[in-house]
Amino acid sequence: MSQPVYSLKQLADFLNVEFQGNGATLLSGVEEIGEAKAAHVTFLDNEKYAKHLKSSEAGAIILSRTQFQKYRELNKNFLIVSESPSLVFQKCLELFIAPVDSGFPGIHPTAVIHPTAIIEEHVCIEPYVVICQHARIGAACHIGTGSVIGAHSSIGEHSYIYPRVVVRERVSIGKRVIIQPGAIIGSCGFGYVTSAFGQHKHLKHLGTVIIEDDVEIGANTTIDRGRFKHSIVREGSKIDNLVQIAHQVEVGQHSMVVAQAGIAGSTKIGNHVIIGGQAGVTGHICIADHVIMMAQTGVTKSITSPGIYGGAPARPYQEVHRQVAKIRNLPRLEERIASLEKLVQKLEALSEQH
């Protein structure tokens, strides 16, 4: 496979952006700004990497119009964009690094498909996939090797299911959904009743899971089905790897849940919420729209106001910051208290002498 090569001007025309510099510069790859060489395209999005601009050997640097006004005197080859530099860099990434498919077009003969399943046109079903009775696979879907689609479940058109994914029975997956390897959608929730003798009896979970359009679910993430209602991930939300979403949880539109976070049962997460890595959210509470939880936040009660929260139990970031500052000052305060105690002892001794 030959490596594509573009001049700076050709690339600017393709991206429909302005450029500064030598339009004949040849570009054949992408790289981080601190490591880019003469044939590489790179980008500046986070200002903390601006320190690399002056010394960068990159053949082209993508930056915003505001950044260009700030750094134009460096006389580098710049691609000047109106949107996020990272988004434009992504277009370059896909231009220079061609996607690789599995090499198994169509429906592989080792796939086991129940005769009542509905398979729409232009579907790719890789080796050893199992599709159960009355399942529906939408047009232009891709089902990866070893995945299982349960009975009466549906996968919306243009969705991509990577290898070894399990979508259990009666689960609804929307359009353009991406599910990474090892994810399990629709497993039984962790619901038990404890008897008078201390024995735990599992409660059958007969609800289901609804994944709306344009959702992405990371590797080895689990989303449990409801006991009698639905667990729902709303449109456009992104779930990272190794996330646990319990029974009858609702995640609102365009929210993000970062790796190793856990959301306990029957909790409702609002729209545009960000849950940081290793955060834990207790059950039967509500989280307002536009809430950001820092990494390892422990949420024990509902959050009713937008804002940034951290700590355990969760509280507004400003309060956490003040408390951390006070904790850092504890050694100095301890020294001051010790000095004051010595001074008090001296004063008491002098008082006794008189």
UniProtKB/Swiss-Prot annotation:
Any one GO biological process: lipid A biosynthetic process
Alphabetical keyword list: Acyltransferase, Lipid A biosynthesis, Lipid biosynthesis, Lipid metabolism, Repeat, Transferase
Keyword Transferase part of the UniProt annotation: yes
Pathway connected to this protein: Bacterial outer membrane biogenesis; LPS lipid A biosynthesis
Catalytic EC class: transferase
Cellular component terms (Gene Ontology): membrane
Active site, per annotation: H247 (proton acceptor)
Gene3D superfamilies assigned: 1.20.5.170, Hexapeptide repeat proteins, MurE/MurF, N-terminal domain
One MF term in the entry's GO annotations: N-acyltransferase activity
Keyword Zinc-finger among record annotations: no
Reaction catalysed by this enzyme: a UDP-3-O-[(3R)-3-hydroxyacyl]-alpha-D-glucosamine + a (3R)-hydroxyacyl-[ACP] = a UDP-2-N,3-O-bis[(3R)-3-hydroxyacyl]-alpha-D-glucosamine + holo-[ACP] + H(+)
Protein family (similarity comment): Belongs to the transferase hexapeptide repeat family. LpxD subfamily.
Subunit (UniProt): Homotrimer.
Official protein name in the record: UDP-3-O-acylglucosamine N-acyltransferase
Source species: Chlamydia muridarum (strain MoPn / Nigg)
Gene: lpxD
